[in-house]
């Protein structure tokens, strides 16, 4: 398939600049894959579509305050975006402007806190060693909001309410729509919950630069699926319930582990790239936001629901002025 097959027109004003309050008041487009039917609801109406015996699989990763502003000894301003911890006090990071940071360059954050560039990393990143603890480092940082969000948004609002495992540089945004009250209603209905971790890296958002999408290489991301979740997944399948993935990160993790030898728990890195045609072996339904044109995430939902149906739904969403991307509205696809 070609990259241009996943393009669509999106007016800039439909890119959500701030989240909806309360979280579950966001709009919800419901897509029935089999009947090719589209409905328009509010996110809290998801209760109507989830049933007793369904398993809602959530990514409980927590976003780190990854964006930090510093300066060189010359006074030149440098922006640091933490990507991944390599070892104690050593991180892979993006730096801006990159031309000003070479091997041995020191970046100061205040009078006592600084980092030194040890080396170049992959694709223009840098390996930085900090002279402060992780806790002190995180106090200097702020939410790494996507570049298309121009408004300031509180760090807490860029986390899911159930986030607990620190390590992502972007939120698993499908989960941002859930409230405590909504989770309680789902629980009362008999919906089960299971948690996994996939630490979202910038690779998820890396633009596809090749017209033949099969040539695109995904960046690998760390995941962990505990034994309790593994057991719940296979019990749900055995009992005829549905595996409902909250977000594309949960989908990628689930469809990674089902292709591995059966284990009690799973821990590793995945670079799975899901695009049409793809055989989904675990995921039966998906909660997700509206994704960028030509993105790997749009390819994933196209693989799940059919490209033509998804592109039709996106065009309808544009006409009906749905809000797009990280703080935008949601889709439920089943």
Swiss-Prot record:
Belongs to the QueA family. GO terms for biological process: queuosine biosynthetic process; tRNA wobble guanine modification. Its main location: cytoplasm. Pfam families: Queuosine_synth (PF02547). Transfers and isomerizes the ribose moiety from AdoMet to the 7-aminomethyl group of 7-deazaguanine (preQ1-tRNA) to give epoxyqueuosine (oQ-tRNA). Its EC number is 2.4.99.17. Signal peptide: none annotated. HAMAP family: QueA. The keyword Repeat does not apply. Pathway: tRNA modification; tRNA-queuosine biosynthesis. It is found in: Cytoplasm. It catalyses: 7-aminomethyl-7-carbaguanosine(34) in tRNA + S-adenosyl-L-methionine = epoxyqueuosine(34) in tRNA + adenine + L-methionine + 2 H(+). This is S-adenosylmethionine:tRNA ribosyltransferase-isomerase. PANTHER family: S-ADENOSYLMETHIONINE:TRNA RIBOSYLTRANSFERASE-ISOMERASE. It comes from Thermosipho melanesiensis (strain DSM 12029 / CIP 104789 / BI429). Monomer. InterPro entries: QueA, QueA_dom1, QueA_dom2, QueA_sf. NCBIfam families: PRK00147.1 (NF001140), queA (TIGR00113). It is an enzyme of class 2 (transferase).
């Amino acid at each position: 398939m070609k990259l241009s097959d996943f393009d669509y027109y999106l007016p800039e004003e439909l890119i959500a600049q701030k989240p909806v309050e309360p979280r579950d008041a966001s709009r919800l487009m419901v897509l029935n894959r089999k009947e090719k039917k589209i409905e328009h609801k509010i996110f809290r109406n998801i209760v109507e579509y989830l049933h007793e015996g369904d398993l809602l699989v959530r990514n409980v990763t927590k976003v780190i305050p990854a964006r930090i502003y510093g300066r060189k000894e010359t006074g030149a301003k440098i922006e640091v975006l933490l990507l991944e911890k390599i070892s104690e006090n050593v991180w892979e990071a993006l730096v801006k402007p990159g031309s000003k940071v070479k091997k041995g360059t020191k970046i100061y954050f205040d009078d006592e806190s600084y980092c030194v560039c040890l080396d170049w990393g992959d694709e223009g990143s840098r390996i930085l060693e900090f002279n402060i603890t992780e806790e002190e480092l995180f106090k200097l940082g702020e939410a790494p909001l996507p570049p298309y969000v121009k408004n300031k948004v509180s760090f807490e609002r860029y986390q899911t309410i159930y986030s607990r495992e620190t390590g992502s540089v972007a939120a698993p945004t499908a989960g941002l729509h859930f409230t405590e009250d909504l989770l309680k209603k789902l629980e009362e209905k008999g919906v089960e919950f299971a948690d996994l971790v996939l630490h979202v890296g910038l690779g998820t958002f890396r633009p596809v630069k090749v017209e033949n999408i099969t040539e695109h290489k995904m960046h690998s991301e760390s995941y962990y699926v505990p034994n309790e979740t593994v057991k719940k997944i296979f019990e749900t399948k055995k009992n005829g319930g549905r595996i409902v993935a909250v977000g594309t990160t949960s989908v990628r993790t689930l469809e990674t582990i089902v292709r591995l030898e059966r284990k009690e728990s799973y821990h590793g890195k995945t670079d799975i790239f899901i695009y049409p045609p793809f055989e989904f072996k675990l995921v039966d339904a998906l909660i997700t936001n509206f994704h960028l044109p030509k993105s790997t995430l749009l390819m994933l939902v196209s693989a799940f629901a059919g490209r033509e149906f998804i592109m039709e739904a996106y065009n309808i969403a544009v006409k009906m002025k749905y809000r797009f991307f990280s703080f935008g509205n949601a889709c439920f696809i089943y």
